[in-house]
Amino acid sequence: VGSDAGATFIFIAGSIATELSFLLVGIGYVSFRSSFQVPIHVPDRDSVPALVGGLGMGFATAFLSLVSTDAVLPSVELSPGFMQYTNLAAPTGVGLVIAAVLSLALIGPVEEFFFRGVIQQRLRASFSARTAIGTAGLVFALFHLYPVPFLSPPIAVVAHMALYYSLMGGIFGWLFERTGTFVAPALAHGVFNAVVFVAPLFT
């Protein structure tokens, strides 16, 4: 698959294992709290502007992240362990297409079910929308940062990644709050990731 079938296999296996853990924990919580329900319904027409806006904000955030990365990375020294981690299991060629399909069918739906449908909605029952969205976004960032802090990266790199994932989590959280269904952020998350994965095929 692509130029490195091994990397693609590791990516697929790692993604499935990670998403399965999120799914099992989320289902376990919902099963334990019988009164807790995750809102699942197809977004209506009124949700389309929010979906488009959420995707737009996501791509804008990604663009600004890339621009700032080009400015930050040349000025810092990256450890060999961090460099090896960032290059680990990077899909190529057909692997990018597989990654895009996984994003739409698994990664987007499962992560939004867990981080927005379960975590954010549970927080929303006790706190304001801003607090719930922000806290769920931070938890989202924490899971995406692991195990980067243990690879001796510069503080600037950790801060940059934490800010990026927190903002993305906040965007998906806003979309969940705005539409009232985790299907909306799941769709936006999946489409966003899919576009990011297949974009290199056209460059």
Question: Where do the language-model regions lie?
Answer:
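Cytoplasmic juxtamembrane interface segments
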Residues: 27-46, 171-174, 179
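Transmembrane helix-loop-helix hairpins at the membrane interface
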Residues: 93-203
